[in-house]
Regions:
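ABC-type nucleotide-binding domain
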Residues: 2-194
Length: 194
């Protein structure tokens, strides 16, 4: 589901951060300050236009409310997360942020306003610091370290052979899955979504 593969941090990025679907129209509404209300109403979705993956899904999240999607493999948790981030367009229904249809919001503004950590972590070959900074490329070292502390990753990072300068290889294969997840949380934190 979503975009797979590890891509070096250039103009191309992993599906989590800047995936673009060739058939999606860009929104026109500038979204500068997210209040945080999310409404999905009667959402239907299929990846291929034929086999429906989600049918008549509705949810409402109040500003500041934390929601966890739990369920069996294949139940649609990742799909819902991908739709909330508009990695795909829905077939039917509505998704609105603060009363604004998600299709009208500029994708860059939407993605900047959301912090998402998916179950499958995407890290790239580079330093720990570079992998955290990937959440916001202009973040300072101090901001990245603060994000790592917020994610409870700073202590394990400092125990690595080169600390924040430790090179990660092959999607972070030299880290445990839990450590990689903490880096992903730090990456989302440094992006500083409202």
């Amino acid at each position: 589901e979503g975009a797979d593969g590890v891509i070096e941090p250039t103009e191309q990025r992993t599906g989590i951060w800047a995936w673009r679907h060739p058939h999606q129209a860009e929104g026109t509404v500038t979204y500068t300050r997210l209040r945080g209300e999310l409404v999905m109403e009667g959402v239907d979705f299929s990846y291929d236009g034929e086999k429906e993956v989600l049918h008549d899904i509705s949810l409402w999240a109040k500003p500041g409310q934390k929601i966890a999607f739990v369920g069996a493999t294949g139940a649609g948790k990742t799909t819902i997360t991908n739709l909330i981030n508009r990695f795909y367009d829905i077939d039917d229904g509505k998704i609105r942020y603060d009363g604004i249809n998600v299709n009208k919001i500029r994708k860059s503004d939407l993605r900047r306003s959301l912090g998402v950590v998916l179950q499958e972590v995407k890290l790239f070959t580079g330093t720990v610091m570079d992998n955290i900074r990937y959440g916001r490329l202009d973040a300072t070292d101090e901001e990245c370290i603060a994000a790592a502390k917020l994610a409870n990753a700073d202590s394990f990072i400092r125990r690595l052979p080169e600390g924040y300068d430790t090179m990660l290889t092959g999607n972070g294969s030299n880290l445990s899955q839990g450590q990689a997840q903490l880096l992903s949380i730090a990456r989302a934190a440094v992006a500083d979504p409202p």
